C-alpha cells in the first residue's frame, strides 16, 4: 500500500486569501492569525496575496478570479456570518459555502474555507485562532498534496 504523508512545508507555495470585510474586526484578526501561521509554515510573505470583498457572498467571485489566474497553489476564504433574526443567515452561509466548493472543483485548486457561521459574536471570537490557523495548515497541506498528485499523474503519462 502506498501512503502519502501530510506535508506542511509551505516553502515555495503561493497562497491567495479572500477576506470578507463584513464583521471586519473578527475577519481582520482571522487574517492576521492565518498569515502568521502561513509564515510559520514557511510561506514567504511575498507569496501571500490578500484580496478583500464586502461580504461572504462576494468571496466566491474573488476566489474564482484568483484561481483562474493560475498564480496560486491554494486559496483561503475568510469571513464571518453571524445569525440574525431573518432567513438571510442561512442564505449567505449556504450560498457562500457552495460557491467556495464550486470554485475549488471547477479550477482544481485547494480552498480552505474559514468562513465562520455562528450564533453570535462571542462564538466567532472564540473560534478566531483555531479556525484561522487550521485554514492556513489545510491550504498548505492540500496544496502540497495536489501538486504531488499532479506530478505523479504526469509522470505516469510519460
Swiss-Prot record:
Keyword Transferase: yes
GO molecular function annotations of the record: 6,7-dimethyl-8-ribityllumazine synthase activity
Pathway this chain belongs to: Cofactor biosynthesis; riboflavin biosynthesis; riboflavin from 2-hydroxy-3-oxobutyl phosphate and 5-amino-6-(D-ribitylamino)uracil: step 1/2
Alphabetically ordered keywords of this record: Riboflavin biosynthesis, Transferase
CDD domains given in the database record: Lumazine_synthase-I
Pfam families, sorted: DMRL_synthase
Gene Ontology CC, one term: cytosol
E.C. designation(s): 2.5.1.78
Alphabetized Gene3D superfamilies for the sequence: Lumazine/riboflavin synthase
Phylogenetic placement of the source organism: Bacteria, Pseudomonadati, Pseudomonadota, Betaproteobacteria, Neisseriales
Annotated (2S)-2-hydroxy-3-oxobutyl phosphate binding sites: 85-86, 127
Family in the record: Belongs to the DMRL synthase family.
Name under which the protein is recorded: 6,7-dimethyl-8-ribityllumazine synthase
Active site: 88 (proton donor)
Domain of life: Bacteria
Binding site for 5-amino-6-(D-ribitylamino)uracil: 22, 56-58, 80-82, 113
Tagged with keyword Transferase: yes
Amino acid at each position: 500500500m502506498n501512503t502519502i504523508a501530510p506535508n506542511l512545508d509551505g516553502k515555495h507555495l503561493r497562497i491567495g486569501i479572500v477576506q470578507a470585510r463584513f464583521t471586519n474586526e473578527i475577519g481582520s484578526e482571522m487574517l492576521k492569525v492565518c498569515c502568521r501561521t502561513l509564515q510559520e509554515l514557511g510561506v514567504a510573505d511575498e507569496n501571500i496575496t490578500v484580496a478583500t470583498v464586502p461580504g461572504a457572498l462576494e468571496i466566491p467571485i474573488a476566489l474564482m478570479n484568483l484561481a483562474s489566474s493560475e498564480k496560486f497553489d491554494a486559496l483561503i476564504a475568510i469571513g464571518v456570518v453571524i445569525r440574525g433574526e431573518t432567513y438571510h443567515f442561512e442564505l449567505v452561509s449556504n450560498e457562500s459555502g457552495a460557491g467556495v466548493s464550486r470554485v475549488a472543483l471547477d479550477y482544481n485548486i485547494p480552498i480552505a474555507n474559514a468562513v465562520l457561521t455562528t450564533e453570535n459574536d462571542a462564538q466567532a471570537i472564540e473560534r478566531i485562532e483555531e479556525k484561522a490557523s487550521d485554514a492556513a495548515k489545510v491550504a498548505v497541506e492540500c496544496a502540497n498534496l495536489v501538486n504531488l498528485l499532479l506530478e505523479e499523474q504526469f509522470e505516469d503519462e510519460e
